[in-house]
Amino acid sequence: KYGPATGKTVDVLVIANCVALENRIFLEHVLYNNSSLLVQLGLDLDEMAARMAGTPPAGWPRDKRVWQNLRQAASPAGPLSVISPVVGFDLDRFVRANLDGLWNQADYALLDSAYADNFTFEGPTDRKFSGAADYRSLLESMRTAFPDLSLQVDEVYWMGNDVDGYLTSERWSATGTHAGDGLYGPASGREVQIWGITQHRVHNERITAEWMLFNELDLMMQIAAAR
């Protein structure tokens, strides 16, 4: 799949969002940082995306039914912050508003108001940094590539308390048109599907750490297929 063995050691971030009932997982979404894996193996991402799009795996690209099923929530039917609002710090509302503001509204002031000064970030394809500047650059490059990008939050889960802090997991999906040059090469006009999982560490109502993956290699394959 990835060519001859290289003997290289790789370090690949994996994020899983599991839903369990009575100590049994009945729904699991997993994202592997496959684009980072390819880079660590010394492979060219654009070449690999084009090759894989030319000989795609079974079930690719996703049809509308599969995509809509992916975007559905397991339970509850609506956000808890709407169904059962709380007094004080509402973590469900906080993380939903953060994702909507950053990705849909381009409200980059949230990087100062919702995040700690030196928050850490680990994301797709070896993106690791601290602080707001690099994160804003990533968001702006995505907005340039997909000017009409529209993200919806599919599910939110969390654990913790106001004293010790919280850990959150947000599963999300987005659609957009590759109408801008830049991050993924010249505009292709391709309508794309993006899905991701973002996890946060939250303390004193500020995000202190974020781990985020989305289907970047798959996204590059979608664009390559349109060329």
Enumerate the language-model features and the residues they cover.
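C-terminal and inter-domain tail/linker signature
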Residues: 1-227
